[in-house]
C-alpha cells in the first residue's frame, strides 16, 4: 500500500509540475519547426542491463512517438527526427543495424498513419527493407488523406549534412550552364536544393543524452537555430523535459546573427 501511495503522490506532483511548466510557456512565441536528435539508446540498454541493444532503440523510438504527440498538442507545424546517419550505416555491426532498421520501419508505419511524413536523406545506401518503407510513405502522402493542419514529420534517415550540401551543389552545377554558375550559386538556390527544400529551417534543436554537438545534423539549416541539450538518454525523455525546452525557447530573444 505504501508503494502505491508513493507512486500516486509522485504522479500527482509530476502532473502539477507539467501544468505549471505549460503555464510558463509564451504561446505567442512557439517554435514552428522543432528537431530532435535521438541519442543515448545504446547507453540506456546497457544501463538497464538489457540483453539486446535493440531494446534501447525500440524504447527510443517509442519515446520519439511520444515527442511527436507532445509537439502536436502545441500545434507545432514541423518536427524532424534524426534517426539514422550515414555514419551509423557504415559503422554499426550487421546485427545491430538489422535490428535498428526493423525498429525504424515499425516507427515509419506508426507515424505515417497520423502525420504527413517526409524522408530527409539519401536512399542510396539504405537497406532494401528501409528503402521500401520510405517509398510506401511517399505513396501514402500523395493520397492527401491528411488535413491541411496536419503536422509534418521529417524523418532524417541515411542523413549526412555534408553529403546533403555536396549533393545540392552538384544538382545546381548539373542544372545551369557553366557561365551562369557564379550568379546561380546563392544561399537561396542551395537551400532550395537541399533535402529539406521548401521547408522552414528548424527553430529549435533538442538533443538527448548530454552530448553537446550536432553530429553532422543540418549544418546549413541550423545557422540560426536555438539549441537545447538534455542529460536524459533518449528512452528516458519525459514530457516535462520537452516542456522545459519549449519554455526556454519561448522566452529567448533570438538575434538571428545580429
From Swiss-Prot:
Cited Pfam families: Prenyltransf
Active-site annotation: 39, 88 (proton acceptor)
Record's cofactor remark: Binds 2 magnesium ions per subunit.
Cofactor(s) this protein requires: Mg(2+)
Record's subunit section: Homodimer.
Record function comment: Catalyzes the condensation of isopentenyl diphosphate (IPP) with allylic pyrophosphates generating different type of terpenoids.
UniProt-recorded name of the protein: Isoprenyl transferase 2
